[in-house]
Amino acid sequence: MGSAFPNSSFIGIDFSTEAVNVALTEAEAMSLTNVDFYQQDAAEIETSEKFDFITTFDAVHDQARPREMVASIFKVLKPGGYWLCADLCASSHLGENLDHPIGTFGYTVSCMHCMSVSLAYGGEGLGAMWGAQQAREIFTNAGFLLSLIHI
C-alpha cells in the first residue's frame, strides 16, 4: 500500500516483535518512507493520532480480546473514517456451516491455531468460524455502523 499510494502514510501494528521487524526490513528494502510499524496489542492501540482508514485481514478471530480490539479500532478512527475488516465468511451457528465449502478446514485451523493463540493469552478463543452474526454483534457494540457487509 505504501508504494501504491506514495502521498499517504501508513502505520502497521502487530503483537509480534518478529513480525514488526520483518515488516520494517521489507519496507526498508523497498525504500518506503511513508510506512512505519510498531509492536502493540491491538486491543490497546496507543496513539494520539486518528485514522481515515484502518484494515484488518483474517485477524479479529485470533485476538485474545477481540471485543477490546474492535473498540480500540473504533476509538482511533476519525469521525466518518472506515474500517475494512476482511475475515472468513461463515455463520456463528455450527449447523449452518455443515455445507460450508471450507468449513472442515476452518474448524480444523481454528482448533490447531486460531483458538490456541487466543486461549494461550486467556482469550475468548473465537476461531476462524466465529461467524457473521457474532461479528455484527461485536462490531455494533463497539459503535460501528455496518454500512456494507459482503458475505
Predicted regions mapped to residue ranges:
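Conserved small/polar residues in nucleotide/adenosyl-binding loops
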Residues: 149-151
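A short acidic, Gly/Pro-enriched loop at the edge of an enzyme's catalytic core
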Residues: 43-54
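C-terminal alpha-helical "lid/dimerization" subdomain adjacent to the S-adenosyl-L-methionine
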Residues: 86-141
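A short SAM/SAH-binding and catalytic strip from SAM-dependent methyltransferases
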Residues: 52-66
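Conserved SAM/SAH-binding beta-strand->alpha-helix loop
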Residues: 16-18
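Conserved SAM-binding strand-loop segment of SAM-dependent methyltransferases
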Residues: 30-42
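A short glycine-rich, Lys/Arg-flanked "PGG" loop and its adjoining helix->strand segment in the class I
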Residues: 67-79
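Conserved SAM-binding motif I beta-strand of class I
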Residues: 9-14
